[in-house]
């Protein structure tokens, strides 16, 4: 995988995304007590997408081994569990679509989406 330029680029993107989340978390800590609702909503959306993409990257690095099970009857590997759990990150605490609507309506003051 380290010889694949696309995998290397995705690893770099994941590292950068992690650094972005760290800086944003530190910035939010610095402004404790302030109204950070918009930032919190954006952070949740960013994190859930980052985590999902990182799980997909892990599966792509494993290649065909990502589809193998460890033992009978059916035991997922740690990476397989992580990948499947990361998919849920985009759903619980509000799906990404709902998060985008909330960011637009509450954070940016856009008109409500017709229901």
Where are these regions (language model features)?
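Alpha-helical interface subdomain recognition
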Residues: 1-115
